[in-house]
Amino acid sequence: MSRPRKRWRDVDGVFLLDKPQGMSSNDIMQKVKRLFQANKAGHTGALDPLATGMLPICLGEATKFSQFLLDADKRYLVTAKLGERTDTSDAEGQVVETREVHVETPQILTALEQFRGDILQVPTMFSALKHNGKPLYEYARQGITVEREARPITIFELNFIEYHAPFLTLEVHCSKGTYIRTLVDDLGEVLGCGAHVTMLRRTAVADYPVAEMMLINELELLAESFPLSELDRLLLPTDTAVSKLPALHLDVEQSKAIGFGQRVKFANEQQLSGQVRLFSAENLFLGVALIDGNIIRPQRLITQSA
């Protein structure tokens, strides 16, 4: 007798996955989507297969706000091996250069100063950035190097954790668009010995709590033993994806107009400007709007369940 077909459903929220090593972000996202039987899913910035750690998975209506998490600050713990450069700048690549390591901790501390604050970074060829519609990594795999422009990034914190030659461990708090592999490769060049990433763990995205993260095998066990309603309790509310934005609570009439996508006048006693989170009179999350003086302009709205 054939098994009943899985029924996909509308389910909204953010699942905090502790990504395992060895899987692509897209593969693990698809697995989470299947376990929740969700109609729609999206991740919020890929982690390399080598990397582990926090990967927020947006389900349903939360996918409308995934860009906010893609743009959010991130934190990483990274271990680099000095003395070797690879073509991918991590341990999955081929070693392309080997040099002796004559580096002491004081040299490392001095070198780190160059990478704090606002800097320019040339993205690695082994990245998903596109050139003429094709990801850079596809060119790299064909042995083709494409000219890349340096991009502005911000390293808010770059903390020395430990150094046991040839392995160096650092903690990084950075802006969107930062490639940790490139950061390590550049640091290795400043130190004069080369370096590549051997361990990378994302420890934070925006303000999401580390304690809420769950491993995929834990989710699989729960899915085998409990109904979907129990799995849904693991989801964080959709509005957590935009928690950095100020909140604006509307009255009944304003909520109704916003629901139809209409602009709304309001007193703006809080003197708000820019993007805000909108909540109805019943404290339901409505979406994101742009405040222009005393006008609320809807930008991205939740589709409310009937």
Curated annotation (Swiss-Prot):
Protein's name in the database? tRNA pseudouridine synthase B
Kindly indicate whether the keyword Lipoprotein belongs to this entry.
Answer: no
Drop me one GO molecular function for this one. RNA binding
Tell me the enzyme class.
isomerase
User: Can you tell me which family this protein belongs to?
Assistant: Belongs to the pseudouridine synthase TruB family. Type 1 subfamily.
Disulfide bonding pattern of the chain: none
Q: Can you tell which superkingdom this protein's organism belongs to?
A: Bacteria
| Keyword tags | Isomerase, tRNA processing
A Pfam family recorded for this sequence = TruB_C_2
Q: Which EC number(s) does UniProt give?
A: 5.4.99.25
InterPro entries given for it?
PsdUridine_synth_cat_dom_sf, PsdUridine_synth_N, PUA-like_sf, PUA_sf, tRNA_psdUridine_synth_TruB, tRNA_sdUridine_synth_fam1_C, TruB_C
Main role?
Answer: Responsible for synthesis of pseudouridine from uracil-55 in the psi GC loop of transfer RNAs.
Q: Write down the Gene3D superfamilies for this protein, in alphabetical order.
A: Pseudouridine synthase, PUA domain
UniProt record, GO biological process: mRNA pseudouridine synthesis; tRNA pseudouridine synthesis
The species this protein belongs to is Haemophilus influenzae (strain PittGG)
| Active-site residues, Swiss-Prot/TrEMBL | 48 (nucleophile)
Task: Name the chemical reaction catalysed here.
Answer: uridine(55) in tRNA = pseudouridine(55) in tRNA
